[in-house]
Design a protein with these regions (language model features):
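Conserved alpha-helix/loop element of class I SAM-dependent methyltransferases that forms part
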Residues: 29-48, 63
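C-terminal alpha-helical "lid/dimerization" subdomain adjacent to the S-adenosyl-L-methionine
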Residues: 2-6, 10, 15-24, 28, ...
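A generic alpha-to-beta junction signature in SAM-dependent methyltransferases
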Residues: 42-44, 67-68, 142
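A short SAM/SAH-binding and catalytic strip from SAM-dependent methyltransferases
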Residues: 118-131
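A short acidic, Gly/Pro-enriched loop at the edge of an enzyme's catalytic core
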Residues: 107-118
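A short glycine-rich, Lys/Arg-flanked "PGG" loop and its adjoining helix->strand segment in the class I
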Residues: 132-144
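Class I SAM-dependent methyltransferase SAM/SAH-binding core
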Residues: 49-108
């Protein structure tokens, strides 16, 4: 495996030196711009309880904390490298009791029913096993009327996804129609999918 492939194969589950490089890169550049774009499609109450699944380098947790200054944000990721980085980035909020980051999987969310006002998933659903079952888990931990936000770097419509899917084991880039279908099957309502024509970003929102 070449250097380029070694680095980007860490996108699914960052590990070791290249994993640390990956999570650092997740926190800036186009990833930051895309996250801000995606967040423009949801309102976050000042006292909201938020969960960020696949929290990566922790920058989106920090953005969410700023959006709900009287609320709390929890993060979960199955990469110990990502958990450690997210904890470092959000150390002050963790010390203040406004943030918690833990290791875990989107397939078995360790939270109570109806715990969160908002659940976010930035650049992560590509890797979720059994996508509809994972979505049902998200639905379970949301409060009635709570929102689910998905933000993906690729809308699956350009053909670029084939290159990444060959390079990154277990990756699937969902098209807008695929996401609508899976969210509907999982029990979500008020589903909206937005795309960015310039960058081919994708954002989906859905309600419980």
């Amino acid at each position: 495996m070449g250097l380029f492939s070694k680095i980007f194969s860490n996108a699914r589950k960052p590990e070791g030196f290249f994993g640390r490089m990956m999570v650092n890169g997740m926190n800036g550049g186009s990833h930051a711009r895309m996250a801000q774009w995606g967040l423009s499609f949801v309102d976050v109450a000042q006292e909201a309880g938020v969960l960020d699944i696949g929290c990566g380098g922790g920058a989106n947790i920090a953005r969410l904390l700023r959006r709900c200054p009287k609320g709390t944000v929890q993060g979960i990721d199955y990469s110990p490298v990502s958990v450690k980085k997210s904890q470092e980035v959000n150390a002050a909020a963790i010390a203040a009791g406004r943030c918690k980051v833990q290791e875990g999987s989107a397939a078995t969310l360790p939270y109570a029913d109806g715990e969160f006002d908002l659940v976010t998933a930035f650049e992560t659903v590509y890797f979720w096993p059994g996508i509809e079952e994972c979505f049902r888990g998200v639905l379970r931990v949301l409060k009635e009327g709570g929102r689910f936000l998905i933000v993906n770097e690729d809308d699956g419509l350009t053909g670029n996804n084939e290159k990444w899917e060959k390079m990154i084991d277990g990756m699937h880039t969902y098209t807008p129609d695929e996401l609508r279908t899976h969210l509907t099957a999982a029990g979500f309502r008020d589903i909206a999918v937005h795309t960015n024509d310039q960058h081919h970003w994708l954002c989906a929102t859905a309600a419980k």
